[in-house]
Amino acid sequence: FVGQRHLLDADKPIGKTLADSKLHSMILWGPPGSGKTTLARIICRQMGAHFEQMSAVLEGIKELRNVLDHAQRYQQHNKSTVLFVDEIHRFNKAQQDAFLPHIESGLITLIGATTENPSFEINSSLLSRLRVYVLKKLNYDELSIVANRALESQSVNLEDDGSLSQII
């Protein structure tokens, strides 16, 4: 994972969480392209949990019920479920409240992603049960690493003629 050292280094909040294997519900707040979705997937994989994903733009309570059914089945087999909700700020108060009993019971660990300030967009009852982590925009060097990895994975080689800097 590239960037976000202020969260991921061994002595930083998410780094400690992964080292201690003590996952908690959280909000990942940052600009588009800062790695919110990728980080959620990595956290889930590191913790050995089942990953479910929802988009608050496209889905609602009906889909949440389906996810909760899956989570109950996994829980019966002693496997935890991480529910990643992209654009969580798009859910209304009632939809956000629907997460509360399931976070409190431990059925799901919620990781919400938002580009908006959670203090204004996430209702206080839900926000009080989540830790908020601020992701920073990737800098030029970090974007270069990401771009080079993507190009290498596709066996594309750019000559050192400034083409990469135009991509970034």
Placement of each model-derived feature along the sequence:
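A short, basic N-terminal segment
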Residues: 2-20
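Short glycine-rich substrate-engagement loop in P-loop NTPases that contacts/grips substrate
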Residues: 6-12, 49-82, 93
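Short loop/turn elements that form and flank the Walker-type P-loop nucleotide-binding site
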Residues: 8, 20-24, 46-48, 76-81, ...
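Conserved catalytic/switch belt of AAA+ P-loop NTPases
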Residues: 16-19, 85, 89-128
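Walker A/P-loop
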Residues: 16-54, 69-72, 100-101, 105
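A short hydrophobic beta-strand->loop->alpha-helix junction that borders the nucleotide-binding pocket
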Residues: 30-31, 52-60, 114-115, 135
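Conserved AAA+ ATPase "SRH/arginine-finger" region at the nucleotide-binding site
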Residues: 55-57, 131-144
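Short conserved motifs of the RecA-like P-loop NTPase core
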Residues: 157-168
